[in-house]
A protein has these predicted regions:
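N-terminal secretory signal peptides that target proteins for export/translocation
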Residues: 1-14
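Bacterial N-terminal signal peptides
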Residues: 16-28
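Acidic, small-residue rich beta-repeat scaffolds with periodic aromatic anchors
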Residues: 30-80, 145-147, 154-204
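Repeat-based blade/solenoid architectures
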Residues: 91-105, 153-165
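Acidic, divalent-cation-chelating loop motifs in proteins
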Residues: 106-114
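Acidic/hydrophobic-patterned starts of short beta strands in beta-sheet-rich repeat architectures
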Residues: 113-123, 168-175
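Short glycine/acidic-enriched loop and turn motifs that connect beta-strands
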Residues: 126-129, 179
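Short, surface-exposed beta-strand/strand-loop-strand elements in extracellular ectodomains
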Residues: 133-139
Length: 204
């Protein structure tokens, strides 16, 4: 049966446009949806969200510093920001839970007593081989210069949540939760000229 002549005609400009849009829509429909930064692997009625949260890094630098310059094994690293986390996880009855606990994902200060301003940030990394974990960085922020890494703490873990606060002496406190005793205090050792973790009082 011969094909009708109308079907053999070369599509005009409008027809080509429609075909092009249709192809783009089909490609978009077939493309996988972008993964959310936070996914929950559990029941919120039974566990706190930061316990069951898994974070999926999607950036390749932190404050302009390539991830693989922070650690050679890293391919991705994304610092935590409130705008990346669903509001319903961070707020309870309209109250910012982190703010109420004096916690933050980034804190500025002069943590080693030097003149340049510094910023501490926490986030999630992913190694090129696949494993993920959480990190804490302290970066120098010289006026008019590029940030420079002063301290790195990174741990492979399936529970990547982390937050920061300051103790009454102005020392940085790293939290692995929002309502628990899981924290570590970072201090500047003047004699050794380096940062280090204070001993856990429960282990002494």
């Amino acid at each position: 049966m011969p094909i009708p002549s109308i079907a053999r005609r070369t599509p005009g400009p409008i027809a080509r446009s429609i075909l092009g849009v249709g192809a783009l829509m089909l490609m978009a429909a077939q493309a996988p949806a972008q993964q959310a930064f936070v996914t929950l692997n559990g029941d919120l009625k039974k566990e706190a969200w930061w316990v069951i949260a898994e974070f999926h890094p999607f950036t390749t630098e932190i404050r302009g510093i390539p991830a693989n310059q922070i650690r050679k094994s890293w391919c991705k690293a994304t610092e935590f920001r409130k705008d990346l986390i669903p509001k319903e996880l961070l707020f309870e009855n309209g109250t910012d839970v982190m703010k109420g606990a004096d916690m933050s994902f980034a804190l500025e200060g002069r943590f080693d007593g030097s003149a340049p301003k510094q910023i501490a940030v926490v986030g999630v990394f992913q190694e090129c081989a696949g494993p993920k974990g959480r990190f804490m960085l302290i970066l120098d922020q010289p006026d008019g210069g590029k940030p420079k890494v002063r301290f790195v703490d990174a741990v492979r873990t399936n529970r990547q949540f982390a937050a920061l606060s300051k103790d009454k002496h102005g020392k940085l406190v790293l939290w692995g939760c929002m309502e628990c005793d899981g924290y570590s205090v970072l201090k500047w050792d003047r004699k050794k000229s380096r940062f280090g973790w204070e001993p856990d009082p429960l282990e002494q």
